[in-house]
From Swiss-Prot:
GO MF, one example: DNA-binding transcription factor activity
Superkingdom of the source species: Eukaryota
Subcellular location: Nucleus
Example GO BP: defense response
Cellular component per GO, a single term: nucleus
Species this protein is from: Arabidopsis thaliana
InterPro entries given in the database record: AP2/ERF_dom, AP2/ERF_dom_sf, DNA-bd_dom_sf, ERF_plant
Coiled coil regions in record: none
The family this protein is said to belong to: Belongs to the AP2/ERF transcription factor family. ERF subfamily.
DNA-binding region: 91-149
Keywords: Activator, DNA-binding, Ethylene signaling pathway, Nucleus, Plant defense, Transcription, Transcription regulation
Motif (Nuclear localization signal): 96-112
Comp. bias (Basic and acidic residues): 180-189
The protein's name in its UniProt record: Ethylene-responsive transcription factor 13
């Protein structure tokens, strides 16, 4: 059994703490194990009081010992309401995960009997949640239940929407025009001119042979004389 001196309101008092063999020490009169003096009347009075209490079945209780670090530690406050941080993997309002890993935002329009209105597909659930918040605020105003109410009206955060990829590039206007459509009239400096396609004329050389023409003319002349 051990003791420690403390000052309480200017009066010295002695505190005693429990020892596993406390009862045996008092009942067996093992004075050497007690921090009491036989010559001190006050110590003897304390000893007699403790002995009577132990004989009646009383055992001292040990108060819980707390370290200084635990005493100075502030109590943990539980976050609640809309300001509570979202846990990882938590489902946001108006956000659904696509099978391929992207996140779609949608909202029910009360003006269309609660029909779902698709708001787009996004890379992260936070972007989809912000897109839902903006649509919900436009539909319901201050009564809307939002995922991030502190971002409403802020232009600092802009959700990135995924644009669908085109399967094939769109053909240009020049590719769509055929050769016939290219041969059209155009206006140049106020005067209209018609673009005429080149024509391929195939001429038989027989009709342009000079000797043959002379032979034909002589035959026709002789025929006239006869």
């Amino acid at each position: 059994m051990s003791s420690s001196d403390s000052v309480n309101n200017g009066v010295n008092s002695r505190m005693y703490f429990r020892n596993p063999s406390f009862s045996n020490v008092i009942l067996n009169d093992n004075w050497s194990d007690l921090p009491l003096s036989v010559d001190d009347s006050q110590d003897m009075a304390i000893y007699n009081t403790l002995r009577d209490a132990v004989s009646s079945g009383w055992t001292p209780s040990v108060p819980p010992v707390t370290s200084p670090a635990e005493e100075n530690k502030p109590p943990a406050t539980k976050a609640s309401g809309s300001h509570a941080p979202r846990q990882k993997g938590m489902q946001y309002r108006g956000v659904r995960r696509r099978p391929w890993g992207k996140f779609a935002a949608e909202i029910r329009d009360p003006k269309k009997n609660g029909a779902r209105v698709w708001l787009g597909t996004y890379e992260t659930p936070e972007d989809a949640a912000v897109a839902y918040d903006r649509a919900a605020f436009q539909l319901r105003g201050s009564k809307a239940k939002l995922n991030f109410p502190h971002l409403i009206g802020s232009c600092k955060y802009e959700p990135v929407r995924i644009r669908p990829r085109r399967r094939s590039p769109e053909p240009s206007v020049s590719d769509q025009l055929t050769s016939e459509q290219k041969r059209e009239s155009h206006v140049d400096d106020g005067e209209s001119s018609l673009v005429v396609p080149e024509l391929d004329f195939t001429v038989d050389q027989f009709y342009f042979d000079g000797s043959l023409l002379m032979d034909q003319s002589e035959c026709s002349y002789s025929d006239n004389r006869i």
